A protein has these predicted regions:
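A short, basic/flexible loop-to-alpha-helix module at the beginning of a structural domain
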Residues: 1-11
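N-terminal Rossmann NAD(P)H-binding glycine-rich loop of SDR-like oxidoreductase domains
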Residues: 12-34
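SDR active-site strand-loop-helix element
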Residues: 17, 40, 85-89, 125-130
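N-terminal Rossmann-fold cofactor-binding loop
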Residues: 40-45, 63
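NAD(P)H-binding glycine-rich loop region in Rossmannoid oxidoreductase-like domains
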Residues: 56, 60-105, 116, 134-136
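Catalytic helix-loop patch of NAD(P)-dependent Rossmann-fold dehydrogenases
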Residues: 104, 139-171
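Short alpha-helix in the Rossmann-fold core of NAD(P)-dependent oxidoreductases
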Residues: 105-110, 126, 158-159
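Conserved Rossmann-fold NAD(P)-dependent oxidoreductase catalytic core, especially the SDR/UDP-sugar
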Residues: 112-154
Length: 171
């Protein structure tokens, strides 16, 4: 874990996972001036195109490693926790074949994150799933959270399993 800042100001504090990925880095660039951000990514901050600012604390780590998730969340807890979690981290390899990384990152990483965020004072946990989890509908029929699932490829199955972990954690 690498830390690039240390003192959270009075702003609303958020945790963003997948900060060095496509969705996470774009999200960070959009909100970068409005919050104190704990940004978790596998790559270095400069490699992600996320600006270095006092209100962005870059925490380098792999969510598939439970000890790393524990260290990151313990660090955040010592600084007062976070108000919101935006979980964008995930693995996808474009082959549609089974890959153990789907389980390690998408399923186990989500479970590790959820379990370790329980003591952070989180008001809302936002998870970026995938449309591939749902059955593709006929033209002009909306897909919602209540749409039937039809995860047929390994990536979609891993995202569906992560959704189930989060749903069980909410109850």
């Amino acid at each position: 874990m690498t830390v690039s800042s240390a003192t959270p100001p009075h702003k609303t504090r958020i945790l963003v996972t997948g900060a060095s990925g496509f969705v996470g880095s774009h999200f960070l660039r959009t909100i970068k001036d409005d919050y104190y951000i704990y940004a978790v990514g596998r790559r270095k901050q400069h490699a992600s195109g996320v600006p270095v600012q006092e209100n962005i604390e870059w925490l380098r780590g792999d969510l598939g490693d439970e000890a790393t998730v524990q260290r990151i969340t313990e660090h955040i807890a010592l600084e007062g926790g976070v108000d919101y979690v935006f979980h964008f981290a995930g693995f996808y390899d474009f082959t549609n074949r089974d890959n153990p990384e789907y389980t390690r990152t998408n399923i186990d990483g989500t479970r590790f994150l959820l379990e370790n965020c329980l003591n952070l004072g989180v008001q809302r946990f936002v998870f970026a799933s995938s449309l591939t989890v749902t059955r593709f509908s006929k033209k002009d029929i909306k897909v919602t959270e209540k749409s039937p699932v039809d995860a047929t490829i390994p990536y979609a199955r891993s995202k569906q399993a992560a959704e189930e972990i989060l749903t069980a954690g909410r109850e």
